[in-house]
Structure formats: structure tokens, C-alpha cells
Amino acid sequence: MRLRSLNEAEVITLFTPFVPHPPSTTLAKDMDPFEPLGRALPRRVRHVPYRLDHGMTEMHADFLPTSGAVVIVVCVTTNVLQYNSQAFEQQVKFARAIARRTSGNASVTDVPVILLLADNDASGQGYANAMQDFPALVTINDYTTAALTNAVRVLFGN
């Protein structure tokens, strides 16, 4: 897997949604709920949040040419869906727009794009099935620090 063989100079671009903290969080309220994910990644990380209601912007696309890998988080846990019933559709739209930009840009066509799907309800398999067009899909059952750290272990084999 190319992701595991990134050189030290390559940057991982981490796109994360603006969502509320998980209910069981121990993080400070002024900390992004995905900051532990960025810290756990074993390379330099460019953490770029995205707003569900705005989707991909040119600012997001501008980060792609310098990426050695792209990780896109889609979070559809119960607390997120209670906050925004369109959260899944909005995040999928963002993720697909990023994937199209990478596949359509000659300078980043070999850059791995990984989708990290956080869900915690019975609809989880349906969400995963809807994302099967992504070449790499990792699912986790919440977005606590422990779950995010375990996802990094799966991705990087650490």
C-alpha cells in the first residue's frame, strides 16, 4: 500500500467535517474532535476542516497538489445526524468532489485517497455500501480518540 511507504517529505492532507464532539469525549471543547487523528498520523499532516453546508471550495482543492496522501473523514454518528439530518449526503458530496479532483489532476493521480467513515448505528452498512466507489474505505464505530488512533494503526500497520 502506497500509504505505508510515503517518504518523510510527503504531507498527508486530512479533510475533516465540522461536527459536534462525540458525547463521550474527554477533549476540551475548544479542540477539534479530529485533532487526535491528525496527531496520530505518522507523517506531517495538513488538517483542513470542511463545512457540511459549503462543500468543497477552491481552498480545499488548492491543498491537493502538494499532498502525498489524502484522508477524508465522513462522520455519520447518531449525534451528528441529530444535529444535521443531511450530514451524510453533504459529506459524501464533499468526499466525491475531492476524489474527482485527485483523479482529474495529473500531478496527484497516484496519490492515495482514503475515506474514513465513522458511524454508530444500524444504518452503518448502508453508509459503507453507498461509499463503495472509493478505492479505500475504513470504517470505525465512533470518533473518540481511541477509535481514531486505532484507525491509524489499521492504515499504517503500526
Predicted regions: what they are:
Residues M1-N158:
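C-terminal non-catalytic regions of proteins with extracellular/luminal or membrane-system context
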